[in-house]
Amino acid sequence: MKKILIAIVLMAMAVTTVRAAHGAPNYPLPQNPDTLRILGVGNSFTDDGMMYLPYLLQAAGIKNVVLGRLYIGGCTLERQVKEYENNNPAYVYTKSVNNKWTTVSKNATMLDGLLDEKWDILVVQQASGVSGKYESYQPWLDRLIEILRFNCRNAGATIAWQQTWAYSTDSNHPEYPNYEQNQLVMYKDIMECNEQLLDDTPIDVVIPTGTAIQNLRTAMQDARDFTRDGYHLNYKMGRYTAACTWFQALIASVFRTTIEGNASRLKGSSQALTDAEALACHLAARRACARRFKVWK
């Protein structure tokens, strides 16, 4: 019994030491709140991930989620920190209330969006071109976490991470040579960085969009690997899969539901999905949330 007690004490001390090394703690996702508020702070990949979330929420009968997007195209973690420190009105701030996006400001500061609501979840990410290069993450990620934690009106907010996805095989993105112009090399490097940041920061909630897109590419063929330009997701199955992943990783966990069976097909738009296409996206997202850093085969 004494040995067991000693082991428990040592484990508790180890956990405390790890948390101390991370600085400010993270907090778990809320459970069944009256209103859930999610803010994405990032770039155009944040847009790709969040754009179709209102459709999925509406189809699920969930009307008590407020969404916000603060983005600058191509914005790195380093630039996020510097834009905050200089209080630059460089962000586009859009918001969804009652499951409909509206543009709040095209000249917002980070604080304009951050202070607008008592956000429950704050989602960050690295710019795609350097998302597989961990030397680009620090010290900027630690500083950004401090900024968000210090300024958020909800002291118990969860800070989460969105994985970026690898480029299409034929992408002409100027930073693709950093990954040998190879999609699988880029995906592997991104996943290694994601696992490293879990060790180095208090973040433990990951939206595995990169793995979901890679799952979809493994299951189905597409001329540009579900991108519209070699790196941004296409407006049909690409963005839909990303939104499904956000839903499964965040919404489903908070409200104890699932993306499986969601009836949204983007009907009435040029991006309407067939049942088979939607189910493939659901499956790619669900598999990614079950296995975040490895393609499901």
Mark where each language-model region is.
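C-terminal segment of classical bacterial N-terminal signal peptides
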Residues: 13-19
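N-terminal module-boundary/linker segments of secreted carbohydrate-active enzymes
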Residues: 21-59, 281
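Acidic/histidine-rich, surface-exposed loop or edge segments in extracytoplasmic proteins
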Residues: 30-40, 120-129, 175, 265-266
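Soluble non-cytosolic domains of exported or imported proteins
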Residues: 32, 36, 44-48, 135-139, ...
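Conserved SGNH/GDSL esterase-like catalytic core that processes O-acyl groups on lipids
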Residues: 47-138
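Alpha-helical cap/lid subdomain in secreted, periplasmic
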Residues: 107-235, 248
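Conserved catalytic region of serine esterases and O-acyltransferases that act on ester linkages
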Residues: 226, 230-297
